[in-house]
Amino acid sequence: MTHAYTKVRQALCYGSATLGAAALAALIAAGSAAAAESHGVATAKAAAADLAAGKADDPVVLKAAPINARRVFVYDPKHFAAISQFYMIDGDTARVVGTADGGFLSNPVVASDGSFFGQASTVYERIARGKRTDYVELLDPQTNNPIADIELPNSPRFLVGTYPWMTALTPNNKTLLFYQFSPQPAVGVVDLAGKKFDRMIEVPDCYHIFPSSNDTFFMHCRDGSLLKVGIGADGKSQTKRTEIFHKENEYLINHPAYSPKSGRLVWPTYTGKIFQIDLSSQDAKFLPAIEAFTDAEKKEGWAPGGWQQVAYHRESDRIFLLGDQRAASKHKAPSRFLFVIDAKTGKRINKIELKHEIDSVGVSQDAKPQLYALSTGDKALYIFDPETGKEVSSVNQLGAGPQVVMTSDM
């Protein structure tokens, strides 16, 4: 059984290709010519000319280009609706190249080699009631067609506002890990290569999942330590706690930035203290913490804020942190500024005025990256040049409440 409906958006809204209905042709012919034609209008006129010439008028579903570092995935949970939606965006052209439906509070994943994107999700027999089914679905990134549909036994998913690192892929993209909260904390293991559920690994009261290798991941525990978990080929897992790296009153945000490829975990607190951990050696190496804001700025109310508040770019070793002046309890409110920080020295490189209320930030992992600033209120993705701080393009009409932005860790 397939749990998602897939589709590719066509020409009028986003300028992809095929149109071809007689009514549309008549409408275009009757309309007044614009001084500067949009791509969609030009495509529609070409389709009308083809129709008049007697060419075939059958609809054609196009394939998207293969994923590159600038393919952006935006997830809209639709304010806790039973059916949610994904938007796939070409960052170079600022166009939606496809959409896919999800279930209730899906957790999106994107393969680091661009071979698929997918979700761990939940649906109900009668849309929002009835028998619950949890599943993992993988989709072809060019057609959006399902390539794997794996049902999870006993409805194990933790249904909470979409936290990207509650579900994760191992570096080889062959295993998906997801978090279970009840009846006891555990991490589910899904064999993507074999297209089957594997097992649950019981863990102590720890959260988030950061794979450091194909058989090892780390979690954050309530006492301020990390838990190292070895999956174990024999079905037996091994666990070991690290040192405690933050104090009880140093509250970490819910959405850290993590690069499985480099093993760098970047985790700010509510006040802008940034902890960095190197997980690349299979052990946790705690780097010196840095401060995003000066003491004077903190007194003025400057602090991180948003849903996904931080992003990390591997090659430049830079941190991008959303921030604004806010009350202490407003750490989930959007921000109007982005702070660019050298991850090695802690030095502030730039302060970008975004001129929009931004909830989530992402960055492409190419040599000259793009910054992606997602506004839930505007239902729009704004694309920036991180060097100049200038907005270069935008994509609007992204659902009801888009909240999560993801790129491939290529």
UniProtKB/Swiss-Prot annotation:
GO annotation, cellular component aspect: periplasmic space
Entry's Gene Ontology molecular function annotations: aliphatic amine dehydrogenase activity; methylamine dehydrogenase (amicyanin) activity
Keyword Transport set for record: yes
Leader sequence residues: 1-35
Pfam families listed in its UniProt record: Me-amine-dh_H
Subcellular location: Periplasm
Gene3D superfamilies, per database record: YVTN repeat-like/Quinoprotein amine dehydrogenase
EC number: 1.4.9.1
Any one biological process term the GO annotation gives: methylamine metabolic process
Enzyme class at the top of the EC tree: oxidoreductase
Catalyses which reaction(s): 2 oxidized [amicyanin] + methylamine + H2O = 2 reduced [amicyanin] + formaldehyde + NH4(+) + 2 H(+)
Key words, A-Z: Electron transport, Oxidoreductase, Periplasm, Signal, Transport
Family matches, as SUPFAM superfamilies: YVTN repeat-like/Quinoprotein amine dehydrogenase (SSF50969)
Primary localization class, coarse: periplasm
Complexes and interactors: Tetramer of two light and two heavy chains.
Task performed by this protein: Methylamine dehydrogenase carries out the oxidation of methylamine. Electrons are passed from methylamine dehydrogenase to amicyanin.
Family membership noted in the UniProt record: Belongs to the aromatic amine dehydrogenase heavy chain family.
Record-given protein name: Methylamine dehydrogenase heavy chain
